[in-house]
Structures are given as structure tokens and as C-alpha cells.
Amino acid sequence: MLPIISVLIGISLMYYIRQKRAEKEMDEIVNSISPSNDSNENIGTRDLCLELLRQLNCEVRIEHDDIYFTYQNEKFMIEASNDSAFFTIWDLHWDMVDSENIQDVENMKKAVNRTNQLVHNTVLYMSYEEEKSYYILSKLQCLLMHNIPNTKAYLSATLDDFFRTKQCYSQV
């Protein structure tokens, strides 16, 4: 009977030690996470966008409610409000197709449809009758809040995805 009690005590002790070690590791993880900056908690999406774009060294121009900026030599536009956590990024007019060339128009439409199946962004085309052309553009609606970890890297990765979209479109 004594050996069985000894084994049970040994197992209980091992379990207790493992639990204490797990608690200690969890406490270390929690303590290593920097507390959120209270001054950023009240910042709205639009203001956060502007702050992050400046941190990314983007040339920023505000026109009415829209934010125009250059990121890696590409022109973008953001629609954002401090009243909503969502914003829309537009990559405007990055390709053009002559509307009189039927074959190019058909290829463009197929490429737009196929690209929309493969990427996160939405690829669109707009017809300009006076110029007799179609312009290709893309957009992405996403969430941006101060408590997303590393918001600068998040926005940068989101913008980088537009380059992937163009690459995908050109390869279709």
C-alpha cells in the first residue's frame, strides 16, 4: 500500500510543479507585453492613418475628406473617418486599356475576374467614354484600431498587398 501512496504523491507533486511553472511562464509573457499607451486609445481611425503614413515616410496630401499619399512611389488614396474603425484604401488608375480594342478589353475583364479570385483586394475597371478607355483600380476595406499589435507593420503589409495584386493581374 505504501508504494501506491508514494507513486500518487509523486505524480501529484509533478503535476503541481508543472502548473506552477506554467503560471510563472504566463506571468512572464503578460509582463513582457507593453501596456497600451493611454494617449493612443482615443485616437480615431483617420488620425491613426495619418500618423502611420507619416511614420512610413509617405508624402501625404489631404483633399476634402480623402487622404492622398505616395507609398513606394505608388499613389494611393484612403477614405477614413474617426467615427468608424474601418477604412478604404484605393490604388487608383494603375492600368489602362483602350476600349476600342475588343480583344484587350476581353483580356482585361478576364484578368480582373481571375485576380479577384486570387487576392484580398478588389480589382475594378471603370469606363471613361470621352477618353475611350478603361482604367483599372483596386481597393481594400479593412479594420484599423490603435489596439491592433504593431499597426505600422499592419498598414505596411496591407499596402504591400496592392503590389501583389498588380503582379497577379499582370500574370493572369
Give, region by region, the residue ranges found by the protein language model.
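Charge-rich, low-complexity N-terminal segments
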Residues: 4-81
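Ordered, soluble secondary-structure elements with a strong preference for glycine-centered loop motifs
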Residues: 43, 99-102, 148-153
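Short beta-strand-to-loop capping motifs
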Residues: 71, 91, 140-144
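A short acidic-to-branched-hydrophobic micro-motif
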Residues: 78-98
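Ampiphathic alpha-helical segments that act as solvent-exposed interaction surfaces
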Residues: 106-120, 141-172
